[in-house]
């Protein structure tokens, strides 16, 4: 099959006037990705297993209504600020900003209206148009687009969820020439603000409806240090060497070893939910992590220019909305590889700042490559 991009209405089952668009990007070899304009959600990611069988490795929801009630943020772009902010407050240019306290005294994933719960505009781009955006990012090492792309756009208004500035945001989705599915973020603001997005994709390389957990899959992380978190899962600014610990994933280890560990950092979050400081190079699309399934034979690498990656194993999956086709999802049924800035970095020193300056265009990239 040649490369193609198709679209269809993605309609609420309860309100026919409520609808998004779904775009499906297909390339040779049996690789297919679908995204919707609500939440910039990746609904499907289909790749061949070791026998060539098409396998949807993306957990998700049944339809638009479920995605709109999607507390787990399946496949969604998160922002303006992904992950946690201590005391739900921060200071920019001498001004203190208070955002909603939605996880105890802290803020998690910005919330409504955040990127994950609004409707985005969309357009289909040619390969040449997508490559122009990739070049404009000035992130080295991103291969060329394979055939075409979908570009989603949303302006987060000044004061949304307490954040300053009108923040014009774009997300480019496309397959690259080396079988990488690329997520390229771009933000530009009229007032200094936070721009720290991620995508909350949940992966199961045996298939989204496969029985059992991901504990028997293997993970590798290009990281020598983790950020220590407090008992509310917020990084304190302290770093810990992974050497000699369960966090040492510089060579493949079973995901279950992490989830079953009695390390206090794991106990806090009922399994792995940790930011790893990556050995990546700023401004370069670099290897961050990989997951492989011996059962399906699928190996997926994560590449990014970002300095951190949150590894999360679906420790809290299990709501009635956590079902896409035939299986109700539960704890440890997925692995998330969330390339991002260090959580709570706006309140810490020694980490890349999530604050972008007025008038400056900022790009970040994350890609999932199948090898």
Predicted regions and their residues:
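An exposed, glycine/acidic-rich loop-and-rim segment of catalytic or binding clefts
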Residues: 2-371
């Amino acid at each position: 099959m040649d490369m193609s991009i198709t679209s269809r209405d993605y309609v609420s089952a309860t309100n026919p006037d409520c609808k998004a668009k779904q775009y499906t990007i297909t390339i040779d070899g049996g690789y297919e990705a679908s995204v919707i304009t609500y939440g910039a959600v990746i609904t499907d990611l289909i790749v061949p297993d070791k026998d060539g069988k098409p396998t949807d490795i993306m957990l998700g929801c049944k339809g638009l209504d479920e995605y709109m009630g999607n507390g787990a943020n399946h496949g969604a772009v998160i922002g303006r600020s992904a992950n946690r902010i201590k005391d739900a407050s921060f200071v920019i240019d001498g001004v203190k900003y208070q955002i909603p306290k939605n996880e105890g005294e802290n803020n998690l994933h910005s919330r409504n209206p955040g990127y994950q719960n609004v409707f985005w505009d969309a357009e289909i781009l040619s390969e040449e148009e997508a490559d122009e955006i990739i070049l404009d990012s000035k992130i080295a090492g991103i291969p060329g687009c394979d055939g075409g792309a979908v570009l989603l756009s949303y302006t987060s208004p000044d004061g949304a969820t307490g954040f300053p500035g009108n923040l014009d945001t774009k997300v480019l989705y496309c397959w690259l020439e080396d079988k990488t599915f690329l997520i390229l973020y771009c933000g530009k603001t009229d007032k200094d603000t936070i721009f720290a997005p991620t995508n909350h994709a949940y992966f199961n390389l045996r298939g989204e409806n496969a029985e059992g957990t991901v504990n028997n899959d293997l993970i590798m992380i290009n990281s020598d240090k983790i950020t220590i978190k407090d008992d509310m899962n917020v990084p304190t600014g302290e770093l810990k060497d992974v050497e000699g610990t369960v966090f040492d994933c510089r060579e493949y280890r079973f995901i279950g070893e992490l989830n079953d560990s009695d390390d206090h950092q794991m106990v806090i979050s009922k399994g792995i939910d940790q930011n790893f400081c990556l050995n990546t190079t700023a401004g370069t699309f670099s290897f961050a992590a990989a997951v492989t399934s011996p059962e399906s034979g699928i190996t997926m690498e994560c590449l990014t220019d970002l300095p951190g990656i949150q590894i999360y194993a679906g420790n809290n999956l299990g709501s009635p909305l956590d079902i896409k086709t035939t299986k109700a999802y539960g704890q440890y049924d997925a692995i998330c590889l969330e390339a991002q800035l260090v959580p709570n970095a706006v309140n810490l020193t020694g980490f890349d700042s999530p604050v972008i300056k007025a008038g400056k265009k900022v790009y970040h990239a994350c890609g999932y490559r199948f090898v």
